[in-house]
Each structure stands twice: as C-alpha cells, then as structure tokens.
C-alpha cells in the first residue's frame, strides 16, 4: 500500500486499518478462514416461527450462524446486533458473562460491515424477536471501508449501478430481484430439460454477424490478423446443430449489439434461443407460452401478475393475431389486397409513417405501419404472426401467401418479448435472402446482415423442418420483478467510465 493511498484515507478508514492491525497482533487473522455454520437466518425463523420465548428456553437449542454485521448497539456488558446473510438478518444478543472477556472485546471492536461467526442459544427477546444468545464469537473478515450511510439503501443511481456490491448489501429489494432472476432462468432450464432439449454452447466470436438485424461490435484477432464480431445472436450456429442431428437444442447466453441504450436496451444482454426439429411456428408458439407461464408461476405463483399497476393475465391463453389484421384493426388500413410499393408508400405518407431509404417493398411499409401504430396497443400477452418476407430473412414463407412468413413475435406491455418462426431450410432461398440483406446494408441499413456462406453450405446438407425461438431474458425478468429499467435486472449494466 503506497503512502499516497494512505494519505487519501478518511478518518474512519484509518481507524479500521488500525483495528485490523490490532487483530493481527492478537494472533487473529483479520481476514479469517473457513467457518462451519449450522443454519442461516431464514432456516432459523422458519424452524422456530411458532415457538414462544418460554418454549425456546425449554428447548435450549443452539445454532451457529455467520454473516455481515449490519447494526450494533448497547453499552457496558450487554450488546445487540443484527447479522446479515444471504437469506436475511438475525438478531444477536451478546453478554460479556456469556462469551467471556476476549470474545466480548471482539464484539465491542467490531465495525459495521465486518463478518463474524456466532454460536449460541436460540431465544426470543421480550419484544418477541428471534435471536441468538451468543456463547462464542469468531472474527471472520475485516471491512476496511464503512458501509453506505445508515444502511437504509443506496439512493444514488450511479452508485447503485457502478457498485452493485454495495447495492446488494444495503437494498434487500434489489438483492431479492437478482435471486428471482436466477430462479427464473433455472426454471426455464428445468422446463426445457423436461422436454428433452439439450443445452449447448456456441461461439461468441463470429467471422460474420448474423441471425438478427443489429449492428455488431467489431474486434481483432491478433494471432490470425483478422477482424471478428461479437455475436448478435446464437441462431445460425444452433441451426447447424439441427443439421447435425441434435434435433432439440437451446442456449442461454450473452448477446452483444452495438446500438443505443434505453430503459429496455443494454449493449450486452442475455437471451435464450431454442430450436426444435420437425416443428413449425405454431408448435413454437405453444412452447413459448409454456416457457413463460412456467417461469411466471415458479417465481410469482398462480394467477395474473401486476406490472406497474396493470394486471397482466399471463396465466391465461395468449391472444394470437396476424400482423395485417392487427394493422387494419388499429388504423383501418388493409394490406391484404395486392398493391404496388408506390401505393404502399402513398398510404404511409397519408398516415405520416416515417420512411427509410431502404424501404423498397410493400413488406417494409407493412412492418413500419405495425411499429408505428400497433405495438403501443399490445398490453396483454399477444402473439403477432405473419411478418413480411422482407423483414424476416431467416423465416420460411407462408405457403398460402408467400408475401408473409410463418413467424411470430410475442408482445406484452407494448414490448417484444419473443421472436420465432418456422425456420427457412431451403439453402437457395436462404442465399437469396442474404443477398437482399447485403443490398439493404449497402443502401444504409446498419442492421442488415451480411452473407454467411458457411451457414448456407450447412443448409445444403439438409435441415429438417424446424421451429426456432428467441426470448429476451432481461425483459422477461423485468416483467416478473415489476421493474421499469433493464439496468435493475443486470448485475453490472454497461456504464460510461
């Protein structure tokens, strides 16, 4: 530790370092060693929930707990404290005549934030709070910095996101939200594993961005002297596994898109993609509904859920509507009759729909109408299907109307939660779509993809009819934790330095 760093320490930090050195002089490792505990705070509260003070005294049972010291009060020969572990807090009752002079000195000199282990009798105070009456204290780790003021929770947003460790210590609501996230992902895995899907891993570094309409992050591989991109989707590699005969696969992993940031977008996020051979988009629609309803039930229980004051009937069958019908219902404009691109553009101008240079087909205009007018109306879980071919380069054409694809998106509270389709398995058609995307890219569409010749070659070996799905894990977690910003469900969101 440099002298410069010591000079920057405040008074509290200096005192804590002095206490650290005093512990070492007493032969106590300031940063401790392994410690065996017999219970956590939640287990004790559950086990003894119905026991009175007198009944606990009669039982005379002991427990060994460990955690971070969050409060401490008292004077003379008696003190109280609260110890925090992963499940919550438990009160400590510490008497000098019960723990001995040396142990009581450890307690007296302990700072808030220190980790200690405590062995003692399970009791209930006169106020009715379940507590541990300590008989032995063990110092486990020294905190050299004071915790956030009064531990009532951080309120500075920058600190919450940059120093998530402090947020987790001081904000139980935040801590529980991330526990819910982990449980949600585990339940999705459990659901798919139960349907005989295999979890796999595919590369994060790609030679060509593909599988989604998004701008990639570019990096350089020094050893091979080639530029590479971080994946914007896992789709193309997973479909190569379907070609290889794996039949049912999924991957939960990080995706990287070099795009804007807002309440629902972070450049680095988590998605799940699922592929099932011999299935179509209708099968995947049912699968999607099952995944989301299973996850919701596991973390929220049966029934509808509340999201920002709106009751979401996530437990009921999801609505299903064709994109063209949804547009007609909201705007009165009917795109079912055949029309020229000029006629479609005229309709767009009439309705003041923003137009982009790469909107060169009726399909682009239909999609623009949907995004402009319909998305904001989709509050209850709704599957919108039948996207135009032009905006669905990896989806199979609908055999009854080849202007559209066998694709759907799931919308809840006006946001997209899933994207899925009957996968395009015709390599000739796939190459043609890739070429159209490459042309759109030249016209200024930054989200258009290039041509992945390796994937086209894989398709030429034959891929069975397949349904595929992508779900945004972070958005789903936002929904199930009643959160309005993606940063609150990412442990470490992207921040400026």
UniProtKB/Swiss-Prot annotation:
GO terms for biological process: lysyl-tRNA aminoacylation. Mg(2+) 1 binds at residues 409, 416. It holds the Pfam family tRNA-synt_2. GO terms for molecular function: ATP binding; catalytic activity, acting on a protein; lysine-tRNA ligase activity; magnesium ion binding; transferase activity; tRNA binding. It is an enzyme of class 6 (ligase). One of its GO terms (cellular component) is cytosol. It comes from the Bacteria. It catalyses: tRNA(Lys) + L-lysine + ATP = L-lysyl-tRNA(Lys) + AMP + diphosphate. Keywords: Aminoacyl-tRNA synthetase, ATP-binding, Cytoplasm, Ligase, Magnesium, Metal-binding, Nucleotide-binding, Protein biosynthesis. Its EC number is 6.1.1.6. Mg(2+) 2 binds at residue 416. Its cofactor is Mg(2+). The keyword Cytoplasm applies. Binds 3 Mg(2+) ions per subunit. It is found in: Cytoplasm. Belongs to the class-II aminoacyl-tRNA synthetase family. Homodimer. This is Lysine--tRNA ligase. It comes from Streptococcus pyogenes serotype M49 (strain NZ131). The lineage of its organism: Bacteria, Bacillati, Bacillota, Bacilli, Lactobacillales.
